[in-house]
Amino acid sequence: MRPMTPRDKIRNFSIIAHIDHGKSTLADRLIQACGGLTDREMSEQVLDSMDIEKERGITIKAQTVRLSYTASDGETYTLNLMDTPGHVDFAYEVSRCLAACEGSLLVVDASQGVEAQTLANVYQAIDQNHEIVPVLNKIDLPAADVDRVKEQIEEIIGLDASDAVQISAKTGLGIPDVLEAIVNRLPPPRGGDHTAPLKAALVDAYYDPYLGVVVIVRVHEGILKKKQTIRMMRTGGVYEIDKVGTFNPKLTEADALGPGEVGYFVASIKEVGDCSIGDTITEDKRPTDKALPGYKDVQPVVFCGLFPMDAGDFDDLRAAMGKLRLNDASFTWEMETSAALGMGFRCGFLGLLHLEIIQERLSREFDLDLIATAPSVVYEMSMTDGTEIELHNPADMPDVVRITEIREPWIAATIYTPDEYLGSILKLCQDRRGIQIELSYVGGRACVKYELPLNEVVFDFYDRLKSISRGYASFDYTLIGHRAENLVKLQILVNEEPVDALAMLVHRDRAESRGRQMCERLKELIPRQMFKIPIQAAIGGRVVARETISAMRKDVTAKCYGGDATRKRKLLDKQAAGKKRMRQFGKVEIPQEAFVAALRMDGD
């Protein structure tokens, strides 16, 4: 068991970068340089533990690793690296990781420059008083333009980039310089008395099938040790610690963790939902008087229904959801039934990427075929009797007569784009009811700030933005609250039956065009039947658009040659009566592709 590290020999730091700028690769190189793993154990992106993280090249869960580094001054330092997610959906995880560190490496791709998500995280780091060391990655690429990117860092972020470390994480070039910069330019942990009552921040937690919940902590004051009884200040849970240790990057047991150290503990906690990220952990018998600042409850922003393709898979889906919830407390769900899709769940997510990842993990790790309904956001409603309600599912909207006001969530979006795509991007934002706040030019690129309704962004805004800008635009957003809007519920009726899975709330000005679009799309996608199928879009009791799928008809008069016309008439009338009866009792099956395609807004 190792002794506790003196505080002045500890460096806690995180790596901030936009998606694909080489953050996880740099982390791999640092682990390799410090001998954290042997070459045989080394795999690409050691810290991205989920397959899906490696495939998409993104970090979803924050990870930590402790490294020992002997610097050029002969001293041995303990480096605690926290690898944070880069995506906007996981902004809260990032903020908690940054709060556990004193410094950051800002990694910027020398061929691409500063992107929107880099900025969001850098500003968070600056708010936490971080010392920031700029690192220019991929300098071996032919397209790398080091001077231009240094200029961008100085102009956009306002950091001095003259002594930025230049590296290529892929080839390992410049990695020793990064390690020296961490030791010499980043500060050791501030304050922290080891005799004071325990005060530690809960940075993250994950579920291990053997150990149960493993909690990642950063100790600020006091000592965290085995057999100690601790209390979570937020949730009030009291636990006895079974194991304490650090990530090297494998779990390595220790006797205790002192001030400034980052490590883990295991304490027979049943599920990750019992641990709130950002909570303060203290001793049960001798608690600290004040919790650490910055905690907030993570609220789901986007909701959608998930239904099994085969109704028999419902129990498997429920079990799979329970397992995912063990590891991801920000994902919420409750059961719901849909007339069109049967039994399923209404799920809440932090954002669209989070939704996609959960869906993909359900189908990949649990081998489930799922139908997902259109993502929707949380609307607030003021009722005539003075009550306030939240609406998660447009199909459950109460009668319009009882509602005095509907408010929808708005976001402040920042978009960075090369100049040539600016026109199309402005048009996209205008089409989505956006309000332009600011347009500025920085380092040869346009920076557009817009306020947009989240409802308009939630389905395919990001895909459209990427396709318009050939992937060059980057996008970041923060929620700015709810605003009252003139919203109506658009219902789609197939064969005069409302399809609850296709119900949505839209702005009154756009309801008609949206309804027409949906009807036209469904007309192409629903297979023809033996009877006529009307497809209608309705607001309240008023139909605003209609398409009709014509019936397939058999030529019943083919066998009549000449002869009496009444014979033909009789056969045609018989066919018409049969079709009428079919239309009365016939159920129209809507194929899954029709659901998905009908929900994609812009036909391209």
UniProtKB/Swiss-Prot annotation:
Intracellular or extracellular location(s): Cell inner membrane
Residues where GTP binds: 20-25, 137-140
Pfam family, one: GTP_EFTU_D2
Annotated PROSITE patterns: G_TR_1, G_TR_2
Entry's Gene Ontology BP terms: positive regulation of translation
Record EC number: 3.6.5.n1
Keyword Amino-acid biosynthesis annotated: no
PANTHER family listed in its UniProt record: TRANSLATION FACTOR GUF1 HOMOLOG, CHLOROPLASTIC, TRANSLATION FACTOR GUF1-RELATED
Name recorded for this polypeptide: Elongation factor 4
Lineage: Bacteria, Pseudomonadati, Pseudomonadota, Alphaproteobacteria, Hyphomonadales
